[in-house]
Regions:
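N-terminal Rossmann-like dinucleotide-binding module
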Residues: 1-43, 47
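Proline-centered loop/turn at the N-terminus of a beta-strand
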Residues: 4, 31-34, 54, 84, ...
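Short alpha-helical
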Residues: 14, 42-43, 64, 93, ...
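Donor/substrate-binding cores of folate-linked one-carbon enzymes
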Residues: 22, 84, 88-160
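Short, surface-exposed acidic-centric catalytic microdomains
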Residues: 28-72
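N-terminal glycine-rich "phosphate-gripper" loop used for MgATP/nucleotide binding
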Residues: 37-38, 61-62, 66-67, 80-96
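Short, well-structured alpha-helical segments in soluble
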Residues: 71-79
């Protein structure tokens, strides 16, 4: 039975597109119920539409604070029938209340091998350090940026 997934994204949606492509190839068993984007005009919106997946554009600047925004996002996730949340280039920290609404069901895709090179510049930081091996990490999200338990990692040779 596939995971019922909500995808939170802020930008171009390349991670989201990779998920869609993997589902279509039959190598990822998820049902993407909704994409929630916090930035109007982000390319992920077009990608979701092209894939036939509902996309809710929820501009975070239209809420008075992070807590009320995260409550609205959690409500949208629940209304879509999703039980797991994937952060795919989502450039916002989540509140403890959001994480508690989906305990051990929020994952992040990070473009570096954690615990090395956390943060929004992880890939660039790895390159700046001159690492010979880099990769990506999928991990559970907790209240500390890029800190939660690692689910899976993939290592590849670094290229300059």
């Amino acid at each position: 039975m596939p995971l019922k997934l909500a995808v939170l994204a802020s930008g171009s949606g390349t991670n989201f597109q990779a998920m869609v492509d993997a589902v279509r190839r039959g190598v990822l068993d998820v049902d993407i119920r909704i994409v929630i984007c916090n930035r109007p005009g982000a390319r992920v919106i077009e990608r979701a539409k092209a894939a036939g997946i509902v996309c809710a554009v929820m501009d975070h600047t239209q809420w008075p604070d992070r807590a009320s925004y995260d409550r609205a996002v959690a409500d949208a996730v629940r209304k879509a029938g999703a039980d797991t949340v994937a952060l795919a280039g989502y450039m916002r920290m989540l509140t403890p209340d959001f994480l508690n609404a989906f305990p051990h069901r929020v994952i992040n895709i990070h473009p570096a091998l954690l615990p090395s090179f956390p943060g929004i510049h992880g890939a660039a930081d790895a390159q700046a350090w001159g690492v010979k091996i880099t990769g990506c990490t999928v991990h559970l999200v907790d209240e500390i940026m890029d800190h939660g338990a690692v689910i899976v990692q993939a290592a590849v040779p670094a290229v300059a």
